[in-house]
């Protein structure tokens, strides 16, 4: 993908912007998934059959019909088959536009959010607004699996290198869930760091954990959006490890009141949106 692609030049991300506090759906901006998928060779057919970009929006507020502020937390699922992903700063600005606008009730806001996101993503989107009372009952979760981070290895290079996965399997057939908290990449536009925890669930020849960790650490200076990184990890593992079944799930830390948690799989459904310790 060309980072200077014209479709990225119009994004508000990385630019000084005005904060609008009256509802305006035109603030939402899309990024074509095709940009990254062309580079991965999966624009026509994706190697995953289940997936979504799972967002949590913590800063949602509007006025009721009497002018009293209301607040909620949103769970949003944007289907992996949608034509576009949603650019995060535009999503933040769009949500801010609800702040001084009046709506009848939570259900009306939820419906408007869903309609607008569907139009921007050009695909299926699910939205659920949660009261703070309900959300407070959600515990801090952990991604199931064996953590691969405590290996006694030396890292000298932090440039992205998929070839670190070359010859990464042995002949032992296993089902494993492996977890790393060391995923870090950078925003495609602003170069700001994106911190994440990634879970890899697979059935196939056993993956060498040292090679996998070196590969994940190689994202440390790589510039891509969250969703693109997860699809790249999925494609690289399918190429080098060739598992029979594979899921890749990353949960990223919050920025601007939003966290993004992409999930891609060729065999299991989308997980519940459960926040981790860093979220």
From Swiss-Prot:
NADPH binds at residues 88-89, 255-256. Its EC number is 1.7.1.13. Keywords: Cytoplasm, NADP, Oxidoreductase, Queuosine biosynthesis. GO terms for biological process: queuosine biosynthetic process; tRNA modification. Pathway: tRNA modification; tRNA-queuosine biosynthesis. One of its GO terms (molecular function) is preQ1 synthase activity. It is found in: Cytoplasm. The keyword NADP applies. The active site is at 187 (thioimide intermediate), 194 (proton donor). Substrate binds at residues 86-88, 226-227. Pfam families: QueF, QueF_N. It catalyses: 7-aminomethyl-7-carbaguanine + 2 NADP(+) = 7-cyano-7-deazaguanine + 2 NADPH + 3 H(+). InterPro entries: GTP-CH-I_C/QueF, NADPH_dep_7-cyano-7-deazaG_red, QueF, QueF_N, QueF_type2. Homodimer. Catalyzes the NADPH-dependent reduction of 7-cyano-7-deazaguanine (preQ0) to 7-aminomethyl-7-deazaguanine (preQ1). Belongs to the GTP cyclohydrolase I family. QueF type 2 subfamily. This is NADPH-dependent 7-cyano-7-deazaguanine reductase. The lineage of its organism: Bacteria, Pseudomonadati, Pseudomonadota, Gammaproteobacteria, Pasteurellales. The gene is queF.
């Amino acid at each position: 993908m060309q980072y200077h692609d014209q479709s990225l030049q119009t994004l508000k991300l990385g630019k000084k912007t005005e904060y609008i506090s009256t509802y305006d759906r035109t603030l939402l901006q899309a990024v074509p998934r095709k940009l990254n998928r062309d580079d991965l060779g999966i624009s026509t057919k994706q190697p995953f059959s289940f997936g979504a970009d799972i967002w949590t929006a913590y800063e949602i507020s509007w006025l009721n019909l009497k002018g009293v502020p209301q607040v909620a937390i949103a769970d949003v699922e944007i289907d992996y088959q949608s034509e576009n992903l949603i650019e995060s700063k535009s999503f933040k600005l769009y949500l801010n536009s609800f702040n001084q606008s009046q709506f009848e009730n939570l259900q009306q806001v939820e419906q408007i959010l869903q309609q607008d996101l569907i139009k921007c993503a050009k695909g299926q989107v699910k939205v659920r607004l949660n009261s703070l009372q309900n959300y407070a009952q959600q515990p801090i979760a952990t991604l199931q699996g064996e953590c691969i981070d405590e290996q006694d290895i030396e890292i000298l290079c932090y440039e992205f290198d998929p070839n670190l996965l070359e010859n990464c399997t042995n002949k032992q057939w296993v089902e494993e869930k492996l977890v790393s908290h060391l995923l870090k990449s950078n925003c495609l536009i602003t170069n700001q760091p994106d911190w994440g925890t990634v879970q890899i669930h697979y059935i196939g020849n056993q993956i060498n954990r040292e090679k996998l960790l070196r590969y994940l650490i190689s994202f440390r200076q790589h510039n891509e959006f969250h969703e693109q990184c997860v699809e790249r990890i999925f494609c690289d593992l399918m190429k080098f490890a060739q598992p029979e079944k594979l899921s890749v799930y990353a949960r990223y830390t919050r920025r601007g009141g939003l966290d993004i948690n992409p999930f891609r799989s060729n065999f299991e459904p989308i997980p519940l949106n459960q926040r981790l310790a860093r979220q």
